[in-house]
Amino acid sequence: MSQWLAFATQLVGVRKSHQLALQFVDLLTQGLDLSDSLLLLPSSDGRLLVPHDPQRQFAWSVTDFDVPFAHVLQSSNAMHLTAEELVFWQSNRTFSQLTSRVGMFDSVWIQPLPMDTRQVHSILLLMGESHGIVSAFENADFLKFIEVFSQQWSLLNDMEREEQRRLELKQSLTDIERDSAQRSLANALSRTLIGESAAMQKLREQIVSAANSQLSVMVQGETGTGKELVAAAVHELSSRKSAPFVAINCAAIPEHLLESELFGYCKGAFSGADSDKQGLIAQANGGTLFLDEIGDMPLTLQAKLLRVLESRTFRPLGGKQELSSDFRLVSATHVNLLDQVRKKEFRQDLYYRLFQYPITLPRLAARLEDIELLSEHFVRVFNLQHNTRIRGLNYRAIDCLKQYDFPGNVRELKHLIEFGCAQTADGTQVEASCFAHRLQTLPCLAPEATPVAVSVETENVDLEPSVALAGEPNFAVIHDLKQAVSQFEALIISERLNRFAGDRAKAAKSLGIPKRTLAYKCLKLEIKTP
């Protein structure tokens, strides 16, 4: 068996294309005693020719006709350049440096591969003694060696492309399954975090995303929006769900007790410390620590918390040894922490440590479409707790609730529904009259108005100066209170829209209500914008 056929048998056993290229070039260099050899391959985007060996850091454009490779690609014909002919190919610096070692009796052979087709997949560059290279391409065994490489190269590339497609398909299916699982989790959350508004759907998606990460979560929202529910949901959907969820309200505990609650203490640490007590940080090991109203945490304690977050170690009060705790931190606040940072009331370094994954909860007034679902849920809960059969809310009661701004958000709605259910006979619906008198009148800017006391049969309601009409109204002509209130409200909104030339944003701001609420009232009261 000739040398080249022996070399060919070595190539057949290679199973990786990059290994095949390296071995092919090494065998060529060895068999022809070359000064240099390269296999040039197309880049991933097909715009460049790059060496088979990634350690050789150079490349040529496939359209750069200052080098012979572009001509070979275009013609699919080999090119043989002697030392004298290389003089005319010196404009490209990289090619000039590559061929600088070509001597008087040497030459450069540039061969497109495979040799028997115009479908070029690579270019072979050989540099060495001219007679030896030319003779090799007249040797049948050498040509068979080149053919074996080309066939093996095509086979391995086809197999690798197929494997890549299989992996991409598998990854695509994995992504689809993950997205489907996340959607399922988000849908499951709708039983706890109720609402079909866009804001609530986005919130549930954020919770699922946050749960899948290991980042510290900051839950922001007004009082009554459900911050602890969100924190608990992040824990329940995370990999730590089987470990403890430990919660503490930083605003509900005196400053001098908060540190001992968090860090725990050792016996004798202070007067009354008769035994060791494990702190909440230790209790949360493996699980989640929820710090509610973290904006009320004292500055001195903020520094200690930051150290715990950075080192994952802590020392109980009176303790001499550092202890470790692996916990996920979820914190919440209803205040603007960034303002507190500017006022030097909250540490900036802790602020950035807490805000790795911020989640902002929407106000109830910003998702009026969810009020009916929430109300039905609270009625069902009331029925279960009190063994009653309240049949939901009357549509007028729903309309009444949708006109209210809910400064106390979902918690206030819950209490209103419970109050209404308590006054409703079993088997009937909750009427608007059950809680309407508890709804605070929305403020209206009217500095010229004077206070007017309205007397009704059930109770006296003193209207604020800002919401009373100027002059003395004739209450004797009022026989439908709800209609009178609606007309009064329509007059105020119409006046304000006229004042601002139909600009609903300015009108809503002047009335102290969200633009969405104003739009709802205009639709309900059939108010036309000027």
UniProtKB/Swiss-Prot annotation:
ATP binds at residues 221-228, 284-293. GO terms for biological process: positive regulation of DNA-templated transcription. It comes from the Bacteria. Residues 193-422 form the Sigma-54 factor interaction domain. It holds the Pfam family HTH_8. InterPro entries: AAA+_ATPase, Homeodomain-like_sf, HTH_Fis, P-loop_NTPase, Sigma_54_int, Sigma_54_int_dom_ATP-bd_1, Sigma_54_int_dom_ATP-bd_2, Sigma_54_int_dom_CS. One of its GO terms (molecular function) is cis-regulatory region sequence-specific DNA binding. Keywords: ATP-binding, DNA-binding, Nucleotide-binding, Transcription, Transcription regulation. One of its GO terms (cellular component) is protein-DNA complex. Transcriptional regulator of the type VI secretion system. This is Transcriptional regulator VasH. It comes from Vibrio cholerae serotype O1 (strain ATCC 39315 / El Tor Inaba N16961).
